């Protein structure tokens, strides 16, 4: 089981954590939402819970709760800039379909 970050994503997360001044890492998860069933969660973590799995890649701790791990295993988090837009992108090998707007997915 693993979660990885591109160099671009690791730099962006490190920058956010540095400016924030606190936090142990980046928490990734999934929740039920959208027209395809699930949506990604991405937030800063101030603590690690008992059921969390912790990965470290390129100096960044990535924290995933036990329920989300089955959906996120093998995912690579990237940070992309496309024109005037920029943001994090999940490259998830478990996804079988995505909704048209790209906000939700199914496995």
UniProtKB/Swiss-Prot annotation:
Cofactor note: Binds 2 iron ions per dimer. The dimer may bind additional iron ions.
Molecular function (Gene Ontology), one example: iron ion binding
Cofactor: Fe cation
Pfam family, one: Fe-S_biosyn
Gene3D superfamilies xref list: HesB-like domain (2.60.300.12)
GO annotation, cellular component aspect: cytosol
Binding, Fe cation: 35, 99, 101
Disulfide bonds: none
Annotated InterPro entries: Fe-S_cluster_asmbl/transfer, FeS_biogenesis, FeS_cluster_insertion, FeS_cluster_insertion_CS, HesB-like_dom_sf, IscA_proteobacteria
SUPFAM superfamilies: HesB-like domain
Claim: Iron is one of the keywords in the record: yes
Keyword annotations of the record: Iron, Metal-binding
PANTHER family named among the record's database cross-references: IRON-SULFUR CLUSTER ASSEMBLY 1 HOMOLOG, MITOCHONDRIAL, IRON-SULFUR CLUSTER ASSEMBLY PROTEIN
Family (UniProt): Belongs to the HesB/IscA family.
Function according to Swiss-Prot or TrEMBL: Is able to transfer iron-sulfur clusters to apo-ferredoxin. Multiple cycles of [2Fe2S] cluster formation and transfer are observed, suggesting that IscA acts catalytically. Recruits intracellular free iron so as to provide iron for the assembly of transient iron-sulfur cluster in IscU in the presence of IscS, L-cysteine and the thioredoxin reductase system TrxA/TrxB.
Protein name: Iron-binding protein IscA
Organism expressing this protein natively: Photorhabdus laumondii subsp. laumondii (strain DSM 15139 / CIP 105565 / TT01) (Photorhabdus luminescens subsp. laumondii)
């Amino acid at each position: 089981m693993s979660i990885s970050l591109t160099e671009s994503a690791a730099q962006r997360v490190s920058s956010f954590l540095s400016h924030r001044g606190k936090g142990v890492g980046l928490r990734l998860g999934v929740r039920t939402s959208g027209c395809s069933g699930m949506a990604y969660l991405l937030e800063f973590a101030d603590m690690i819970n008992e059921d969390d799995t912790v990965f470290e890649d390129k100096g960044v701790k990535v924290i995933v709760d036990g329920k989300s791990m089955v959906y996120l295993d093998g995912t690579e988090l990237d940070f992309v800039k496309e024109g005037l837009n920029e943001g994090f992108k999940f490259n998830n090998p478990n996804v079988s379909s995505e909704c048209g707007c790209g906000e939700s997915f199914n496995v």
